[in-house]
């Protein structure tokens, strides 16, 4: 029996919905040249040539850590 849980990939609309943040904010957090860069925000993963996604567990952990800071 397999005890590992499946890795779930979230596309950008789901990340926007889960975080409550705008697309531009998320991409600012990912951009080291942006003054809004957040090194703790989970990195996007390339799913194909033009598609990216985020691992849901990483987004959930990031949100959990952010809640602890508030």
Swiss-Prot record:
A GO molecular-function annotation: DNA binding
Residue ranges: DNA binding? 12-31
Under the heading Gene3D superfamilies, the entry gives: 1.10.238.160
Please give the Pfam families that the UniProt record associates with this protein: Phage_AlpA
Which InterPro entries does the entry link to? AlpA (IPR010260), Prophage_regulatory_activator (IPR052931)
- GO terms for biological process? positive regulation of DNA-templated transcription; single-species biofilm formation
What does the UniProt function comment say about this protein? Answer: Positive regulator of the expression of the slpA gene. When overexpressed, leads to suppression of the capsule overproduction and UV sensitivity phenotypes of cells mutant for the Lon ATP-dependent protease. Part of the cryptic P4-like prophage CP4-57. Overexpression of AlpA leads to excision of the CP4-57 prophage by IntA. This inactivates ssrA (the gene upstream of the prophage) that encodes tmRNA which is required to rescue stalled ribosomes in a process known as trans-translation.
Protein name per Swiss-Prot or TrEMBL: DNA-binding transcriptional activator AlpA
What organism does the UniProt record list as the source? Escherichia coli (strain K12)
